[in-house]
Amino acid sequence: MITLQNVVKEYTSRNNKVLAVDHVDLEIEQGEIFGVVGYSGAGKSTLIRMFNGLELPSAGTVEVDNLLISQIRGSKLRKARQQIGMIFQHFNLLWSRTVAENIAFPLEIAGVRGEKRRFRVNELIRLVGLEGKENAYPAELSGGQKQRVGIARALANNPKVLLCDEATSALDPQTTDEVLELLLDINKRLNLTIIVITHEMHVIRKICNRVAVMENGKVVELGDVLDVFRHPQEKVTQRFVRQVTDSDETEELIHLLLDNYAEGKIVKLLFMSENATQPVISQVAKENDVMLNVLHGNLTQTQNGAYGTLYVQVLGTEDAINASLTQLRQLKVETEVLER
């Protein structure tokens, strides 16, 4: 659906050059929700603007739905952009137009008139849950409602791709979740390919199938969201994962556990979605004659499945403890004995 090959974006100002995007390769599939996460200055917003030709690469190619966006200009590019909707952090609504008129604006530009345009506007208002707000102006709307208008407007011309550039960054947590649920629903209903640019790992965890982590213009890590959360490889990825797993607090907790539970072994267990809800602990304890005390745990849900982390105290003979750890690994539970 979307292919980036060796994409570079370089800016020149007086005596220095800035490499905003540094030789990026990506393949994004039809119908997936793909996340790009990075801190400010990582290059993610520059990258997404090359998907619809708002920025042109200094080198490399950008292909969307078999069309080389990076090489077309003029009317061909304008036509291609009708198939690539975009929503923004600060909504970019026309403040002198009502909700219905804002949604109708791209249809006007595309030459859609009369009853056909009114029908499409009403259809989109229902899709994003803004019934009764048709004649309201942006100043009368909440932040979440404004973003719903932005989403409806972006979908007006039945695009195949929706670009979301920090679309929830200006919203409170509850409204963020409501907008994310709407994007999930739209993705499933329309089989729409959605690209999400964000610095919030909660957004990635909530709706994305795959994620690319950017730093200094490069994609430094790429994979299924569940895999990236389980085993983040790069330091920047580990920092992002800590946003939603409270790893800093867990480090303090580990020291407390090791200090307060001197007997047996303290073991960290990592459960995957297929065994996160199974009675593994009781089964292993019973079959190996050990006592497993659960000290701390959490469960994280992603679009690829759930994974859970448990910290347990294992009490028993040395042989029984080792046998229980072996059985846990056989049951596809990752184990890590914490050293005192």
Curated annotation (Swiss-Prot):
Q: Name one GO molecular function term.
A: ATP binding
CDD domains the UniProt entry points to: ABC_MetN_methionine_transporter
Q: Which GO terms describe its cellular component?
A: plasma membrane
Where is the protein found, in the record's own terms? Cell membrane
Q: Which transformation does this protein catalyse, written as a reaction?
A: L-methionine(out) + ATP + H2O = L-methionine(in) + ADP + phosphate + H(+); D-methionine(out) + ATP + H2O = D-methionine(in) + ADP + phosphate + H(+)
Enzyme class label? translocase
Pfam families, per this entry?
ABC_tran (PF00005), NIL (PF09383)
Q: How does it sit in the membrane?
A: Peripheral membrane protein
Check the record and name the SUPFAM superfamilies matching this protein.
Answer: ACT-like, P-loop containing nucleoside triphosphate hydrolases
What are the ABC transporter domain coordinates in residue numbering?
Answer: 2-241
Binding annotation for ATP: G38, Y39, S40, G41, A42, G43, K44, S45
Sorted keywords for this record are: Amino-acid transport, ATP-binding, Cell membrane, Membrane, Nucleotide-binding, Translocase, Transport
- EC number(s) for this protein? 7.4.2.11
Known partners and oligomeric status: The complex is composed of two ATP-binding proteins (MetN), two transmembrane proteins (MetI) and a solute-binding protein (MetQ).
* Function statement: Part of the ABC transporter complex MetNIQ involved in methionine import. Responsible for energy coupling to the transport system.
What's the family?
Belongs to the ABC transporter superfamily. Methionine importer (TC 3.A.1.24) family.
The name of this protein is Methionine import ATP-binding protein MetN 2
